[in-house]
């Protein structure tokens, strides 16, 4: 009898503990669901070190959206050269790319922060994400009157880059993700499974008219598997890996192989 009572007591404690864990898990999932927009469309914090690094060689530019919101941007290089437009990752200050790039001979490298990021006002959302990216492309086209020759994007920015594909431009997808849902589920794993993510911004094959123009650049080792996943999903795109070379050298090599 005592053994039976002890066993029942143990089972009861285990079930009670499991119940507590389940309540905690459900609470965390519920919290992530409530705050999904902040994870899907985060605001990039101003990166002071990167901005200090590009002081004196980057020119400030801006892009006015349809609703009057002004986006800050930067351009490095001779503005009469072909333009490389860069879409930063969701939580990346655009200045960080230019600080790492330093310079790109033969190109004017331009990039803008999204609404709500850096010094920009506004609230990022799914409703404005892609339309803002199109306006950014148009603003970059005004730098010298010609559409960007090269369009690059990192992480979720790669989704925006591929949606600007044109017949003659070169696309460089740096450590890309297939969708915002993938990015969130990769970050939180079992805490917030992909099927729960409501944000619906993704790369699809319908976005691609000429896969030969697209190169996936596997830049950071921790995102290597992710880059291969995108490569397999898109098919017939080129993949290149960066090891110790400067970022500018790798990008120039990609543009020369076009």
Q: In which residue ranges do the predicted regions lie?
A:
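Alpha/beta-hydrolase fold nucleophile elbow
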Residues: 144-155
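Hydrolase active-site cap/lid region
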Residues: 158-210
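The feature captures the conserved acid-bearing segment of alpha/beta-hydrolase catalytic domains
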Residues: 181, 192-241
């Amino acid at each position: 009898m005592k053994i039976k009572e002890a066993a029942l007591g143990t089972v009861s404690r285990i079930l009670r503990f499991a119940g507590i864990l389940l309540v905690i898990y459900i609470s965390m999932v519920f919290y992530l669901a409530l705050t999904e927009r902040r994870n899907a469309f985060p605001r990039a914090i101003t990166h002071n070190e990167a901005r200090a690094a590009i002081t004196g060689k980057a020119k400030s530019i801006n892009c006015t959206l349809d609703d009057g919101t002004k986006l800050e941007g930067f351009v490095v290089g001779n503005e009469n050269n072909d333009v490389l437009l860069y879409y930063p990752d969701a939580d990346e200050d655009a200045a960080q790319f230019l600080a790492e790039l330093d310079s790109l001979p033969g190109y004017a490298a331009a990039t803008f922060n999204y609404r709500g990021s850096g010094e920009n006002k506004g609230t990022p959302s799914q409703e404005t994400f892609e339309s803002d990216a199109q306006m950014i492309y148009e603003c970059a086209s005004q730098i010298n009157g010609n559409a960007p020759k090269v369009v690059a994007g990192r992480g979720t920015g790669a989704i925006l880059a591929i949606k600007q594909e044109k017949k003659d431009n070169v696309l460089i997808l740096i450590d890309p993700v297939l969708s915002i849902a993938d990015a969130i589920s990769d970050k939180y794993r079992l805490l917030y499974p992909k099927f729960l993510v409501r944000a619906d911004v993704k790369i699809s094959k319908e976005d691609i008219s000429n896969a030969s123009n697209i190169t996936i650049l596997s830049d950071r080792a921790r995102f290597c598997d992710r880059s291969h996943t995108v490569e397999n999903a898109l098919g017939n795109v080129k993949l290149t890996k960066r090891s110790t070379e400067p970022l500018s050298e790798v990008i120039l090599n990609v543009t020369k192989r076009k």
